[in-house]
Design a protein with these regions (language model features):
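Helix-rich "cap/lid" substructures immediately adjacent to catalytic or cofactor-binding pockets
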Residues: 1-60, 267
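Catalytic nucleophile loop
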Residues: 34, 43, 56-75, 183
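Non-catalytic peripheral regions of patatin-like phospholipases
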Residues: 2-10, 25-29, 78-115, 137-151, ...
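A short alpha-helix-loop-beta-strand transition element characteristic
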Residues: 120-131
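A glycine- and small-aliphatic-rich helix-loop capping segment at beta-alpha/alpha-beta transitions
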Residues: 45-53, 75-80, 150-153
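Active-site glycine-rich loop that binds ribose-phosphate moieties when present
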Residues: 117, 154-168, 179-186
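Conserved small-residue
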Residues: 36, 46, 66, 134, ...
Length: 283
């Protein structure tokens, strides 16, 4: 793992001892914010609740959407990010997606990154008042990478680059993708950065049933009915026509419908299953 933390070490807070015997050191509190796509906006409510009860983290580490929420908090722009999140509607979310037909992901990611930078600004991680890091995965090696320097939006973008959906992000000489591939809820990273108490937020818990195995009875090979077979043969041609058609059709193909999931929903659901299993193994 790449551990290049060069930021300032936050001073340990001292609180008066109730019996007048000097001071008592507060433990260093770490926050590990997990991935989970749109479910991750729940991290905002959790952060506000912690702060309302006087629990202020000294270390924040985020994976995927957790990196976005954690970075906004560390930079002091949680309100702006929440305002933007609340403004998202099905009719305008597509405007943030720069669709690509010949890249390593369906979405380039530049539009979304620009919107995040408009909300958070060109802040550097090493200039933040608290320790902050994001978790990403190196594509070629599978190594877990901790991003602790550079532009905060770049670190966020690398951490949420869901394979197949978003294009990988080049950081230094490494191509990085979503950190949830290796560490969905980065408790280990928070501890490595000095947290003595870690509050972990796993928004993907119980999304899928635990330990459920479904046995299918029947033949292992199913021969489709003639009309089904002809439908399957015609599907690729229709897919190509739709791919180059109007925006409304592209939205339908990308997000899918109740009857048939789209490309995005299939990939995200598959990723969520993997993420849930890894999280349960690591926590």
């Amino acid at each position: 793992m790449l551990n290049g933390w060069i930021g300032r070490n936050s001073q340990e807070a001292q609180v008066p001892d109730k019996v007048g015997l000097g001071t008592t050191r507060r433990p260093v509190i770490g926050l590990a914010l997990g991935g989970g796509a749109a479910r991750g906006f729940a991290h905002i409510g959790m952060l506000r609740t912690l702060i309302a009860h006087g629990i202020v983290p000294n270390v924040v580490v985020g994976t995927s959407i957790g990196a976005v929420i954690g970075g906004a908090y560390a930079a002091g722009h949680l309100d702006k990010l929440e305002e933007w999140a609340r403004s998202l509607q099905p009719r305008n979310i597509f405007s943030y997606l720069d669709i690509r037909l010949n890249g390593s992901g369906l979405i380039g990611g530049s539009r979304l990154a620009a919107e995040l930078e408009a909300s958070i600004g060109p802040t550097l991680i090493e200039d933040l008042p608290i320790k902050f890091a994001t978790v990403a995965t190196e594509v070629r090696t599978g190594h877990e990478i901790w991003l602790t320097q550079g532009r905060i939006v770049d670190a966020m973008r690398a951490s949420y680059a869901l394979p197949g959906i978003f294009s990988p992000v080049l950081v230094g000489d490494r191509w990085l993708v979503d950190g949830a591939l290796v560490n969905p809820v980065p408790v280990s990273a928070a501890r490595a950065f000095g947290a003595e108490i870690v509050i972990a937020a796993n928004v993907s818990s119980d999304v899928f049933a635990h330990g459920t195995t479904v046995y299918a009875h029947g033949p292992s090979v199913v021969t489709p009915e003639p009309e089904v077979a002809s439908e399957a043969e015609a599907a690729p041609k229709r897919g190509l026509r739709r791919l180059f058609s109007a925006e409304r059709t592209m939205k339908r193909e990308f997000f899918g419908s109740a009857a048939r999931p789209g490309i995005s929903s299939v990939m995200v659901d598959a990723f969520n299953i993997m993420q849930d299993r890894i999280t349960r193994a690591r926590l």
